[in-house]
């Protein structure tokens, strides 16, 4: 699987969980202590996310890191 397709699947999963929790990108960014535009870039697969930020986003969404990883990864 290409690096780009992994980023796309990860971003889709973040968006799916965020929307299911009725959170805006801005609200998630605040909870994760990252910039709002960063969340958008992750969801659109425009940014290569670090492990530290994966953990921040997982914690902000109250999910485990593995929950952010698509089952097909």
Annotate each language-model stretch with its function.
Residues 1-9:
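A detector for short, charged/polar N-terminal pre-domain segments
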Residues 54-58, 68-69:
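Hydrophobic micro-packing sites on short alpha-helices
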